[in-house]
């Protein structure tokens, strides 16, 4: 068990930010502490439970595992207040969005999992994406046990999904997106797209390579670049971001001013639009 006091880290905001789909709340009424948030996270085949009350965080893992893996995964070595300090104080909309999502972090997630997750995300919503991912993992992922003896499932490898026909994944509620996942898995297994090489590529080259995968468009490629490869200059534009741009940045978002951190600001905007924009309150 590792206890930390962490600034600009809110596990609930991260969970609801649309960047990760295997982070879910834990409800145990018998020992609930008022004001405490509990989450379970499955990442890179690992299982973690987090308890957070304000800035106080308890990570249910060893100090060694926290230092070597989870600190990196949650990007805890980065001072996000530096990013927020770069926001133009005259931009009241962006200032407000950052304040509402000040606990956001850009997670360092698995590349293959993000490819599948954002292929599934097209014309979809967060609860349904989570359910689809859960179905795939339960059906085709390796079963594992956490420290409490509870089972969870690893994310299935490309080699596993490449062997399926599209109808098999349709049974996991993927619908027409099934063909995207199966064909992308086959492209990776056949060596047409090399994930190890993509991990080493700069942003634009990585995006270009990801676009070779069936079903991957610019928005999906940018999501993968941001949430798996940590290319913070990636700026995915979905319907929420498009609406924000139309309303608040008619001349275009000032990417030059925010060069290198555009993706962080995109997450503040996305989270705000999803949870706090007029009509959401």
Residue ranges, per PLM feature:
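HhH-family (HhH-GPD) DNA N-glycosylase catalytic core used in base-excision repair
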Residues: 1-281
